[in-house]
Swiss-Prot record:
GO terms for cellular component: chloroplast thylakoid membrane; photosystem II reaction center. Signal peptide: none annotated. Its main location: plastid. This is Photosystem II reaction center protein I. Belongs to the PsbI family. Disulfide bonds: none annotated.
């Protein structure tokens, strides 16, 4: 099932990208004094 494998890799890569992007955007060292916007 090549289609299933491609789908799984796409979803995993997407969630990893969201996790890394969210971690960097919420890093206090990169945004001092801002805190969480939630």
């Amino acid at each position: 099932m090549l289609t299933l494998k491609v789908f799984v890799y796409t979803v995993v890569t997407f969630f990893v990208f969201l996790f890394i992007f969210g971690f960097l955007s919420n890093d206090p060292a990169r945004n001092p004094g801002k805190g969480n916007l939630d």
